Amino acid sequence: MTALPFPVAEEPDAFTAETGRKLFAGPSEFVKGVVAMSGLPPADRVEVCFAGRSNVGKSSLINALTGTKGLARASNTPGRTQEINFFTQGPELYLVDLPGYGYANAPLKVVEKWQKLLKQYLSGRQTLRRAFVLIDARHGVKAVDDEIMKLLDTSAVTFQCVLTKADKVKAAERDKVLAQVRAALAKHPAAYPEIVLTSSEKGDGIATLRSIIAHLE
């Protein structure tokens, strides 16, 4: 039987899950919001970033990972908060929340400024180990998602697709979305060959994602 491209990541074994649990058992704190490269905190630890359309559930996922309700705050207005937000997870990890994209109502100058900052950050941050691109399991990959994936390709940043709100779709519909996502990912050389299914509300996939992050060096 031929293996599917971009399989869904399996749940970690007990040892691997414990490594992830220990990492995220430490304190989580907001460090700063950055609007220019000069404001970046010291590149002194492993870093992962989270990208996704507005309302994809990015803040909820970060809060679920850290177990800290309200750590990352959502904005319902695309383009409203044009900052790269840094959070510490213990002494060894930065979680980086990139601004939600989807700019139908955002001024062009705001979009251009954010795109410039994002390109500089992705191409110039040596401690960035992986980007997680969040895709709503109800909708699949949209054109704006494909654009961020292209940017990650050109920046040579490995990215992994995380399907959010997986509990909101039935199995048959989820399989259709997975097929569409796999086809989209196949076009991107920087795509990591595994997909993570998550539900921040129910906690599904959180241990898996914690373990993945814990094993990045």
Curated annotation (Swiss-Prot):
It comes from the Bacteria. One of its GO terms (molecular function) is metal ion binding. The keyword Cell division applies. Keywords: Cell cycle, Cell division, GTP-binding, Magnesium, Metal-binding, Nucleotide-binding, Septation. GO terms for cellular component: cytosol. Coiled coil: none annotated. Its cofactor is Mg(2+). Gene3D superfamilies: P-loop containing nucleotide triphosphate hydrolases (3.40.50.300). Residues 44-217 form the EngB-type G domain. GTP binds at residues 52-59, 79-83, 97-100, 164-167, 198-200. Mg(2+) binds at residues 59, 81. GO terms for biological process: division septum assembly. InterPro entries: G_ENGB_dom (IPR030393), GTP-bd (IPR006073), GTP-bd_ribosome_bio_YsxC (IPR019987), P-loop_NTPase (IPR027417). Necessary for normal cell division and for the maintenance of normal septation. Belongs to the TRAFAC class TrmE-Era-EngA-EngB-Septin-like GTPase superfamily. EngB GTPase family. This is Probable GTP-binding protein EngB. The lineage of its organism: Bacteria, Pseudomonadati, Pseudomonadota, Alphaproteobacteria, Rhodobacterales.
